């Protein structure tokens, strides 16, 4: 396929929009940003905060550590966002918080000055923060995208408002007339200088991986597996290096490390999963700079392409689809053939389809390790001319039809699963 300049620009712009640095899990960070913007307009520290979030944002914010705080949950996200957040920081809103600000945030929580509840909203991704101080109050709403401020109100006066397309209405999609082969062709033929920016993903996520290997964050799965090599319980082979280095980055990410991840489709874990396997394999095969750049771009673009067929947040764990992106990048590094990519992604769909998202938490790193392991296993099968075929399950003989089947299940059939997961999570007894 020959790409017109307008389409080329649109594809690159989409990647630049979806692959951005993010400090901390993006759902609680979205609420922190709403609170930071509200604080900017309030002009003073709040006495109390009322926050409302969509059910999916509640799911993804309940169990994850807010970076730089050592504390889990949306109450901390709202508090530290209001006290120390940078309203212009986007997904790095908490980059410059101090220990003193964290202490103030914890005091507000202990004094029961913060309330977070579920909003009855049409938006899958929605956060609202209302800050109160003496006789003043400011309300800020974010919807559809993690940093998309749609409403600002102060003391009952509307200061800013813009329409927000509901996700299900599907605004124009740059991928509407593209398929997986087009994604492959574009990544290999676009001018190198136009996609060189993707190298930053390797830099940021590699630093996060090293942090996860140096300290015990979250479940410290990557670090634990690394130790087992020294004990002779697992081998120091390419599969385990992929799993260890990718999972370590997720450990650090979910465990509150004060380092940004390069995200993909609004998720740090998806960005990590689309990046680190490519970095590890590129190092293993001594890939040149251009090979690494194109493999990274192919990985991230394929991940975005697949995710564009999904709701922004859903019951399907999206690191599984991000791993299909890195599957493309790694398969290209090892074979240079689209056929291997098609076979491997088909096998992944036959393997890990339907893994649920039960909220952002330290255990996300487990799903990351499972997904990248499936990816590499599927690539090895493709190298031996073996794959899950179109005669099995939801896999079809054509890769895009298989992808569409997976995304249809996530978009429609798993909606009830999502409601059930959220119901279970919000009704669990508090831990002692």
From Swiss-Prot:
One of its GO terms (biological process) is L-cysteine catabolic process to pyruvate. Signal peptide: none annotated. GO terms for molecular function: L-cysteine desulfhydrase activity. It comes from the Bacteria. Belongs to the UPF0597 family. This is UPF0597 protein APL_1605. It comes from Actinobacillus pleuropneumoniae serotype 5b (strain L20).
């Amino acid at each position: 396929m020959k790409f017109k300049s307008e389409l080329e620009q649109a594809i690159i712009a989409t990647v630049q929009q979806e692959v951005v640095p993010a400090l901390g899990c993006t759902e609680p960070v979205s609420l922190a940003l709403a609170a930071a913007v509200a604080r900017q307009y309030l002009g003073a520290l709040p006495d109390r905060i009322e926050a409302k979030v969509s059910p999916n944002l509640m799911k993804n914010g309940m169990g994850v550590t807010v970076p730089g705080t050592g504390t889990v949950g949306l109450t901390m996200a709202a508090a530290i966002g209001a006290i120390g957040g940078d309203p212009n920081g986007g997904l790095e809103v908490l980059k410059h918080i101090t220990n003193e600000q964290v202490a103030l945030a914890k005091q507000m929580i202990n004094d029961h000055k913060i309330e977070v509840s579920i909003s009855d909203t049409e938006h899958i991704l929605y956060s609202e923060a209302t800050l109160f101080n003496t006789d003043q109050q400011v309300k800020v709403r974010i919807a559809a995208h993690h940093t998309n401020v749609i409403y600002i109100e102060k003391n009952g006066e509307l200061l800013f408002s813009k329409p927000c397309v509901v996700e299900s209405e599907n605004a124009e999609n740059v991928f509407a007339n593209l398929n997986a082969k087009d994604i492959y062709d574009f990544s290999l033929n676009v001018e190198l200088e136009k996609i060189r920016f993707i190298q930053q993903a390797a830099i940021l996520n590699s630093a996060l991986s090293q942090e996860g290997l140096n300290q015990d964050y979250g479940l410290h799965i990557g670090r634990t597996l690394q130790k087992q090599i020294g004990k002779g319980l697992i081998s120091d082979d390419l599969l385990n290096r992929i799993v260890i280095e990718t999972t370590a980055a997720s450990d650090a990410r979910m465990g509150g490390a004060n380092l940004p991840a390069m995200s993909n489709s609004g998720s740090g874990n998806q960005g990590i999963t689309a990046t680190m396997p490519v970095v590890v394999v590129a190092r293993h095969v001594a890939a040149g700079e251009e090979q690494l750049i194109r493999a990274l771009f192919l990985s991230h673009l394929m991940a975005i392409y697949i995710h564009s067929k999904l709701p922004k947040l859903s019951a399907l764990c999206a690191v599984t689809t991000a791993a299909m992106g890195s599957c493309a990048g790694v398969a290209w590094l090892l074979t240079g053939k689209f056929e291997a990519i098609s076979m491997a992604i088909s096998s992944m769909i036959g393997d890990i389809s339907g893994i649920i998202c039960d909220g952002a938490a330290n255990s996300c790193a487990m799903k990351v390790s499972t997904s990248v392991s499936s990816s590499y296993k599927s690539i090895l099968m493709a190298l031996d001319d073996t794959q899950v075929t179109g005669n099995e399950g939801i896999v079809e003989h054509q890769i895009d039809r298989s992808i569409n089947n997976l995304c249809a299940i996530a978009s429609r059939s798993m909606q009830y699963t999502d409601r059930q997961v959220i119901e279970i999570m919000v009704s669990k007894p508090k831990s002692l």
